[in-house]
Amino acid sequence: MAREGKRLKSAYADIDRDKFYSLADAVKAIKTRAVAKFDETIEIALNLGVDPRHADQMVRGVVELPHGTGKTVRVAVFAKGDKAEEARKAGADIVGEQDLFDACNAGNMDFDRVIATPDLMGLVGRLGKVLGPRGLMPNPKLGTVTANVTEAVRAAKAGQVQFRVEKAGIVHAGIGKASFSEEKLAENVKAFVDAITKAKPQGAKGTYLKKVSLSSTMGPGVKLDVATLA
């Protein structure tokens, strides 16, 4: 443990907390300092010039990163008949109706994403208090309430990332792993920032992208020069 602590302390040593790094330099700095003994997640955090307490300043959406997140995503699908079979063929981990409802209601939720066909939303809607707080409630705006379960499952498995601004105006997400190349991480960052930019609400006033930073699970954070993200 002492040796691991020294490695982590060393990773923080020469990071300039006041400097705004270019995207290329930030990715390199974070990647080379991800020294934990596991494949650390590379995370992005954006401070936005919005107040999500107002409905016209909510930022929410979904983006499919070009290189995925490196995370194995378990997908549950509420579907029946042919749609249930489509979901299974597409690679869904769990497919069901009342049985899946009962499992969720009992707290057995070994999955990361929930998809539902429109005809079963009457059933799924009753799980709002269970799925909602976990960010798992299917939503047509996010493509998780759909008759096209094949595409929805494929997108989820490919590394589609859902985002939503928090109370303090912050959006954060994992955009890859330390084992990714610098080029792939940079491309994922650009794709995520582009999605956030396109999701700018009409009610937003002043500077929208106020601050962007990158970090790894156990490593230091660095601030990005927003101008290099265009």
Curated annotation (Swiss-Prot):
Record's Pfam families? Answer: Ribosomal_L1 (PF00687)
Q: Does the keyword Cell inner membrane apply?
A: no
The alphabetized list of GO BP terms reads:
regulation of translation; translation
Q: Which Gene3D superfamilies match?
A: 3.30.190.20, 3.40.50.790
Its keywords, alphabetically, are: Repressor, Ribonucleoprotein, Ribosomal protein, RNA-binding, rRNA-binding, Translation regulation, tRNA-binding
Lipid metabolism among the record's keywords?
no
GO CC annotation: cytosolic large ribosomal subunit
- What GO molecular function annotations does the UniProt record carry, in alphabetical order? rRNA binding; structural constituent of ribosome; tRNA binding
CDD domains given in the database record: Ribosomal_L1
**Protein family (similarity comment):** Belongs to the universal ribosomal protein uL1 family.
Q: Which HAMAP family match?
A: Ribosomal_uL1_B (MF_01318_B)
Main role?
Binds directly to 23S rRNA. The L1 stalk is quite mobile in the ribosome, and is involved in E site tRNA release.
- Kindly give the PANTHER family that the UniProt entry links to this protein: 54S RIBOSOMAL PROTEIN L1, MITOCHONDRIAL, LARGE RIBOSOMAL SUBUNIT PROTEIN UL1M
Quaternary organization: Part of the 50S ribosomal subunit.
Q: What is this protein called?
A: Large ribosomal subunit protein uL1
**What organism is the protein native to?**
Paramagnetospirillum magneticum (strain ATCC 700264 / AMB-1)
By which gene is this protein encoded?
rplA
